Design a protein with these regions (language model features):
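Aromatic- and glycine-rich beta-strand/loop motifs that create alpha-glucan
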Residues: 1-24
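Helix-loop-helix units of permease transmembrane domains in multi-pass membrane transporters
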Residues: 71-105
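Cytoplasmic juxtamembrane interface segments
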Residues: 1-6, 73-86, 151-178
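Hydrophobic alpha-helical transmembrane segments of integral membrane proteins
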Residues: 21-22, 59-60, 189-190, 195
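Terminal transmembrane helical anchor/hairpin motif
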Residues: 35, 40-49, 168, 173-250
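Secretory targeting signals
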Residues: 18, 24-70, 100-164, 171, ...
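Transmembrane alpha-helical segments in integral membrane proteins
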Residues: 65-78, 154-165, 229-247
Length: 250
């Protein structure tokens, strides 16, 4: 497994995967940075507004990002038709484990870099609201769970089809459907895994003053049930991907 992981690390270095992992935090900084609050009342709700907006941004960006990472993880085996050759040179378990571990670490890197921008933006914009450590930790766990679930879903699709293009197309369509799920009834959004970032969010709009155009944010209880279902769904997709590799003929 270590040899397979080292090989994935070398391939990722040549593909410049680190730059790809930096893309999402960069887009988020540019996106949110352009909406920098200046009113003292907005600064007092700065972190709440940011943590309310982040799941919506994730529902737009992350399905595509996970599809790109998953497709790049197996692209050389598909383009060069070398998967069957690799199965004869090393065990399928070590090959799959190396790729799975490397993929999860890439997902973890993207999630850490993205949410590390929260205190940075708060510092730069001068938020006066107390830093919500517990809410940020919960958002990190939820984001990582949904990212990993989508990653293995796209990876499984690519293994089934033998082509990275359908996975990318599903990621793009999933981003649109996930965004639309934000405007669906709460129950309907539970049937759209691409948009789980939004129902898992602990922030909601408590009040909007139409006269002053000010928004007051509130929190709701953590959605542990949906988080557990997301983790279970990710585990099922991982197991199906491993079974597909096991059953593939040489």
């Amino acid at each position: 497994m270590l040899r397979s992981f080292h090989a994935e690390l070398q391939k990722a270095h040549r593909r410049h995967d680190l730059l790809l992992c930096l893309l999402v935090p960069l887009i988020m900084i540019l996106w949110v940075g352009g909406l920098a609050p200046s009113d003292p009342e907005e600064l007092a709700n700065g972190y709440s507004a940011l943590l309310y907006s982040l799941p919506v941004i994730e529902a737009i960006l992350m399905p595509v990002m996970m599809a790109v990472l998953a497709s790049r993880l197996w692209d050389m085996e598909i383009k060069g038709n070398t998967a069957k050759l690799l199965y004869t040179l090393q065990s399928r378990r070590s090959l799959f484990a190396g790729k799975a571990v490397f993929g999860v670490l890439e997902v973890l890197l993207v999630t850490v870099l993205e949410l590390a921008c929260v205190p940075v933006l708060g510092r730069v914009h001068g938020y006066t609201e107390a830093f919500p450590t517990g809410q940020l930790v919960y958002l990190f766990i939820c984001t990582l769970a949904v990212d990993t679930m989508l990653f293995f879903g796209e990876f499984l699709l690519m293994l089934w089809v033998g082509n990275p293009l359908p996975a990318l197309c599903v990621g793009i369509v999933g981003a649109l459907v996930g965004l639309f799920s934000a405007f669906m009834p709460p129950l309907a959004s539970y049937f759209v895994p691409f948009g789980y970032y939004i129902p898992l969010s602990a922030y909601e709009v408590a009040n909007w003053d139409q006269a002053t155009h000010t928004v007051t944010y509130g929190t709701r209880p953590f959605n542990w049930g949906l988080l557990a279902f997301t983790l279970a769904l990710g585990a099922v997709l991982f197991a199906l991907a491993w079974r597909k590799v096991q059953d593939e003929e040489v």
